[in-house]
Structure formats: structure tokens, C-alpha cells
Amino acid sequence: MPTGKFSGRFPAWSVVQVDCLDGDTFVKFVDGTGRLTGQVDYREKLDARVWCHVGMAEAYRLVALDASRVTDVSMDVPGANGGSTKELERQIDLLARDVSPFVKGHRYYSPVTYFWPDYYNGATSKWNRTLGYGSSLGVVIMNRNSGDWETFDADFQKQAARALSAGAKRCVFYVKTQYGVAELPKEDPARTGVPDVDKYTQDYILQQIAWAKKNYPNECQGVFLDEVVNGWGAQAPRLDWYRQLFKKIRDLYGKQFLIVVNTGSNIADDFVSADFDICMCFEEKAETYLKNDAAKPVMTDRMMQEPATRWWHVIHDVTKDNYQKVVNQAASLDVAHLYITDGQLVKGEDGQWKPEVNPYQNPPSEWVMPLTIAWVNGYLDIFNRVIALEAKQK
């Protein structure tokens, strides 16, 4: 077999084939981060024999192998035994359904990264501080002006690529949905007080996703749909609108394209079965999280029946005194994605639309990082004992 290692970035969920002069062939599967996984022979699994060759110049840029033995490199399988591209893509998609970077029983630090790319700021970079969490990272969010992706921005491309290289499992691009009110009847009370009330139609949302995927094909691995209904009470009729939106996204980008929704609260039982991958279902103060009011629980019984990897809790106003209680609560609620910050939320006269103090304008303080990494990786108790021991010795 050829010697050497693959290097460079590849389109997420693509297939890479390397043909060698001596007849050896490498067939590799690229995961959602653009990294190569173990050897997978799709010729056996899918009987795929028609490949799209990218040419030698591209081959040398993408792979680092003994060049004398490489004859060609292929990426993305466009056909199988003369069959249609669509059919082969369907088969690959079926296989990809079970390939997820989020493993049952594991925990992930999934930060709310609404701040602008600033990788060039060195030690003062908010992103650099965030990416210091390394392999503990789960989902990261790219947010350009609340989801304006029409034009390419090199800073966003570089920042997203750096996040994936640092250890983030998936990079999703922010698009606001504003609770689906844009397509409600004009007289519907849910539209009252909503800025740009007619803006966020399904067509507008899908166009923003399309631009994000076009401009950042390797980095845009999913969408973060903000301001999504929870399905309770008067919001229940809008669930069908969201189901339609999810289906359109799936039809366009496949199962491997991550759909993350932010409801900010627990969701109605009817919404749990909807085709999203992750729901940010808590976004409140630590005090509220710890109280877990039975009248408005953090997680409903129906939600608790689902895999932990579907849920994402965001807790702000966390302190050194209540941090341990907060992570204990997260463990008891069996949530896989967690963002804990000592940032504060202070709502202004315009409520949630324009808060006076935004808990996401900066990363958490430095004391949060070692505790969170320890919790994610399952050794927080040992970490706390070591810290206590060191304190006694001083």
C-alpha cells in the first residue's frame, strides 16, 4: 500500500480515492469536519466505479503521498455502474445517517459564538480563547449580521476553518427565523412588535442557507436556526411551518447537514419528533436552571426519552459558587451539549430584541475553562480534589 499520510482539507462527507501505479487503491471517507476517517471501500458497499477526477495538480495539493506511485485522485462519487448521480448520493446519504461526530454518552462544550471573527488579534482574540477548549468543542456558530451570507467574507472562512482544525465537531451558520411570523396573516397578534416582521420567510431563510453553503462549501456543515417556536399554546399551529422548512433543508442538503434550532425553552411533545438534529432548549440564568420549576421544567418527560446529543443547554450568570451545582444539574438532565458562562443578560426597554447587557458578547472568564474541560471529559471530581489539595498546601 502507498506510504505517507493524507493532508489538506476536503469537502465534508466526500469520498476520496487515490489510484497508484502498482494497482493499489486507497478509498477514504471524509467526515463532517473535513478530516479523513479510516479506509472505507465504497466499491464493495455501493458498487461505485465511476469517479470524478480532480486532476494531478489538485491531487498534489490535497495529498502528501509518494508522488511516483500516485496516478490520480478522485473526490465525490458521481455515479455507480452507469447509474444516476442521484441514486448514488441517496445511498451515501443512507450510510451517512449513522455517521455522527456526536457520540452517545459523550459531552460537548458547544459555545454561543456570536462574536465576529478575530483570529488576527492574538492573545486578545475572543475566538482564540474559545478554541482553547480544543477537543472538548462540539458545535460552533458562525454569525454574520444575524445571518447575512450573500457575499463571501474571507475572515469568516478562515475563522470557521480554524475552529474545525482546533477540534470543533461541526460548524453551523446562523440564520434567524423570527418564530415564523413573516408568513402569518397580517392581523395575527404574534406579529406585533416584531422588527422587520415580513422579512424572514421560508424563501429568504433558504436563500441565506444556499449562499452560506455556496460561499463556504467546506465550512458550512449545518444551519443554526434562531428564534424558533417551542410549540406550546398559540405557537402550536406554526409547527407545520417549521416541519416544512426542515424538509426543504433535508431535501437540499441531506441528512448529514446539521439542523440546529434555538427555542430557548423546552418544547411541546409534538415538536420532539420533528426532523432537527439539536435543539438549544434552555437559554437562561443559572438561578432558573437550578430551580427547574415543575410548572416549567427545563426538560419534559418526552424530551428525556430522546438521546442526550439532541439537547443543548446554555446557562449564563454562572458563578464560582454555583458552577458545581449547575453541572450536577446538567448531568441529572442528561444533556450532551452545554455552554456555561458568567456573562450576564440584562434586558432593556425593548426586551429580548435589544438587551442592555448581552451574555454572549464575550467568552466566559478564564476560570470557567479548566472546570468545563474537566466536566466534559468526566474528571471534574478529581480536578476539584486536586485543586482543594493544592489550596491546603499553600
Map each language-model feature to its residues.
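Short Trp-Ser/Thr-centered turn/loop motifs at beta-strand boundaries
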Residues: 3, 7, 37, 71-74
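Short proline/glycine-enriched turn/loop motifs at strand-loop junctions of beta-rich domains
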Residues: 11, 20-25
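Noncatalytic modules at the cell exterior or secretory-pathway interfaces
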Residues: 12-17, 53-66
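Short, surface-exposed beta-strand/strand-loop-strand elements in extracellular ectodomains
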Residues: 23-38
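Short beta-strand segments within Ig-like beta-sandwich modules, predominantly Fibronectin type-III
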Residues: 39-45
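Exposed low-complexity, polar/acidic, P/S/T/G-rich flexible segments that act as propeptides
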Residues: 68-80
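Heptad-repeat coiled-coil amphipathic alpha-helices that mediate oligomerization/assembly
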Residues: 80-101, 382, 386-393
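Glycan-processing catalytic domains of CAZymes
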Residues: 96-387
